Structure formats: C-alpha cells, structure tokens
Amino acid sequence: MRMIKALLAALAALVWTFASPALAESRLFSDDAPLQMTITAPFRDLLRTAKTKPVPYPATLAVTDGAAPAQTLAIQIKARGLTRRTGGYCDFPPLQLAFGDKASVHGTVFKGQRKLKLVTYCRDFNDFEQRIMLEYLAYRLYNVITPVSYRVRAAEVTYRKDAGDAGTTRFGYVIEEIDDVADRNHSKRLTFASKAVTAAQFDQHAAARAGLFEFMIGNLDWDFEAGPAGAECCHNARFVAARDTQPLSGVVPIPYDFDYSGFVDSPYAGAPIGLPVDNVTQRLYRGYCASNGEMPSVVAEYRAHRAEMMAVIDNDPRLNPKFRAKTDHFMDSFFALLDDPARVQSQIIKPCRVGIADSGRR
C-alpha cells in the first residue's frame, strides 16, 4: 500500500511539473553555466538603422549549452534600449531576440521563450565588458534577496556579419521575461499607466526590499510610481501581484536596468539633475516613506544575506581583480551603514521619498 501511495505521489508531481509552464519551461534560467552563442546577421544594416528606426533583421543563432551538441535556430534580431542605442556612446546596441513558433525552440535551451532581451557589449574594450558583468551580477544579487526578481543567464556571444566573418566575441546575458517571472512566483503581471498606482498600494515589504536594493547598488535611475508619458509604467520597473489579490493592491515592484548605478559605474552614467549627489557612486535613498515601517525587517534580511551576496561577486572568475576590489569596497560601505542603526535612520528612513498620494500632506 505504501508503495502504491509513493508511486501515485511521484506521478502527481510529474503531472504538475509538465502542466505548469513556469516549471516545465525554466531550463534557460535554472542553470548558471554560461551559454556559448554565435549570432550571424546583417549587423552593418542593423547599426545603420538602430539609432533612428530599429527594424527586425533575420539572423542565425547557434547555441551550445554545456556538453550538449550545438543547435542552430533561425531568429530575428532588433536593436532595443534607449541610452545605449541612441546616446552616441555605445558602438553596439542591446538586442531583442525573437524566436519562431513553439516547435522551432522545442528541445533547445530556449524552450518556452518567444522573445528575450540580450545585453551586449556596448564597446569592444575589456573595461566595458567588466561593467556588463557587473550589471549581470546586480541581477544575481537581487535573486539572493528575493525570487520575485528577474533571472539572468550569462553567455559568451560571438557577433558575425556573415559566415566568413571571425566576428567579435564578448560577455553578454539574457534576461527573463516579466510574464515568466510572474508565473514562476504564482503571481500575475500588472500593467498600468504612469501615476495610476501610488506607493500606498504597494506590498510594503516588497517595496522596501526593492528600494533598499536600489540604494545598495547606488541606483537613482528609477521610479515605481511614474514613467514616460504614453508608456507602460514605470521607469525601470515592472510589477506583479498575487493572482487572487484585488486589482492594483499588494503591488510588488521588480527593478531592472542597472547601468546607471554606482555599482556598475558606467562611463556615460551621470547623477540625475535636481538630486543632492555629485556622481552615481554617491548613495541616496529614494525608497518610499510608505514602506518605512517594513525597513527594520528588510535591513535584517540584507544583513543576513551579506555573505551570500558577497560570494556572488567574489566567486565569479570573469571579474578581474581591479573591478572585484572596487566592487567589494562599494558593497562593504553599504553593509557598514546597515550595521549602524543611527545611520539607517538618518540615511534611509529620514530621507525617504514622499509618494504621490502623500505629497499633499507633507
């Protein structure tokens, strides 16, 4: 009888795994081993149109995942992003990879994927590559704090203009889609216009956690309440909530896009106008006052995960000694602040950002 029950339980677990898209199609982001990718595409044409009017181009993607044989897929690629695409600083823009139907990716590491953001190298220099690695590690740090975060997968990517081109090979990474983040966390994705949701409607623990993360990495390039006019809210954040929650309550912000952070310290990143900082490596807390009540427990979470987060940085062999030492120092200064309750009060609790709903009362 016990054996029958065990078999039934195992069968039920197997059925659940294959019935759940979030579990059945997580191969790409369930492994940390870097992919080997080669993209062959008309990159001269792509670069010519990238700044003004990005259009999709046909491409071939060859990918190797660990010891598995190389697989080749027909895809489309398109320049994406804003600063790195149009700002005149990067020689090469980030890309969007668009796959075909489900059958075209079945049996590959991209099973279940339709579109993916690929973060590329910006400029073909080692220091730029190190900063792309730091962006990748910023995502990994937030994964340590909460599973309600974007997962990323590292890749060594070769970009070729044609089959006879040796190409340029640099570190890059792909980013999980927000719908997959929601499914994986048994949540639903929320979409709304700028200023349609206020800080009072957030899951306050999640909002404090996200706000402290942005402070940790020294990022001021974000807003959880407002975004560009006519675009999905908000600025460098997307949102989910529990599937059974009331509309636009218990909202969980999920930050992304960290190239303007002090943690990365991109050469083109400048401090926002109007804020009392001289450069991006100077931290300023911009989390919302509505979340202050959760901050003591969130600070405790971060302190408890210090060793694990530092290991993410120190155990990555791709980061060179110069950048590792600089990054360790930057992180150590954050944890030194958390160890001092008076500094937490004066540099995090007190300077919090007043939300839209509270702006008339302060």
Positions of the model-derived regions?
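Bacterial N-terminal signal peptides
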Residues: 8-18
